[in-house]
Amino acid sequence: MKFGLFFLNFINSTTVQEQSIVRMQEITEYVDKLNFEQILVYENHFSDNGVVGAPLTVSGFLLGLTEKIKIGSLNHIITTHHPVAIAEEACLLDQLSEGRFILGFSDCEKKDEMHFFNRPVEYQQQLFEECYEIINDALTTGYCNPDNDFYSFPKISVNPHAYTPGGPRKYVTATSHHIVEWAAKKGIPLIFKWDDSNDVRYEYAERYKAVADKYDVDLSEIDHQLMILVNYNEDSNKAKQETRAFISDYVLEMHPNENFENKLEEIIAENAVGNYTECITAAKLAIEKCGAKSVLLSFEPMNDLMSQKNVINIVDDNIKKYHMEYT
């Protein structure tokens, strides 16, 4: 089991843009000295539910601040970006960091963004797949020469070529059954979302297994990752109230067709929120449901920076104990 962090960079009545960005930098430098494997940064546009619209740019900055930890995008939305530009940036970051960059990518979850970036909603899945093929060709071979319904141009060299043989490690966010099935055929590991229920994550994991088996994908090589929100406090009610305030606007935006109160309670119950027993129990169950080999933690629901660091230290101590026991 490997452990990393992810940053959502939400802003609200208690956190302004500058504070969110400064905290991300400070926590990144702090955990670089610890035993965490990686840090991934969330992409969002046009709302307060994430102030980073360019996670590759932020990744480059954070890679420059650090020495050993891997850093990358959590959900770079390839459907609304030019695939060659993504490949160029990814290869450049892979070179500059000498292999510490990770490309987590995603389909677009918001129809408004598809319209804003002038992308055809009716062909969204096809566009996503074609974008990936261009990016993958560039990362694995250094070249691409697409001829499809969306992109067609002569063979080009994508410079610089990747530092890592085969390109940087890639993950795709599990945003739908279509994406999960597509990823399983390709053998691309998933990132399970923190706001999906355990039942949904279980369903995605089982569907991935079934499709991967059909296409002879070696599941032992697949290292799915699971996002978990963390707010540990022996005053369980305080932890839950803080987390509720942190995620409320996001739930309203991203889950408009679900009962607001029920969805909030579900997320709080199925992430590591509350006292020690509640946090451990919820995290273990979530991991068991989806079979993830890596866990990505966000401590952002905790308002106090020192409290975040204290809980990070607790997790780090457990990582050290885990490695001592199993290595």
UniProtKB/Swiss-Prot annotation:
Effect the entry attributes to changing A85R: In strain: Hm
GO cellular component, one term: cytosol
EC number: 1.14.14.3
Main enzyme class: oxidoreductase
Alphabetical list of Pfam families matching this protein: Bac_luciferase
Keyword Oxidoreductase set for record: yes
Entry keyword set: Flavoprotein, FMN, Luminescence, Monooxygenase, Oxidoreductase, Photoprotein
InterPro entries noted in UniProt: Alkanal_monooxygenase, Bact_Lucif_Oxidored, Bacterial_luciferase_CS, Luciferase-like_dom, Luciferase-like_sf, Luciferase_bac/NFP
Gene Ontology molecular function terms on file: alkanal monooxygenase (FMN-linked) activity
UniProt subunit comment: Heterodimer of an alpha and a beta chain.
UniProt similarity note: Belongs to the bacterial luciferase oxidoreductase family.
Record's protein name: Alkanal monooxygenase beta chain
Annotated organism of origin: Photorhabdus luminescens
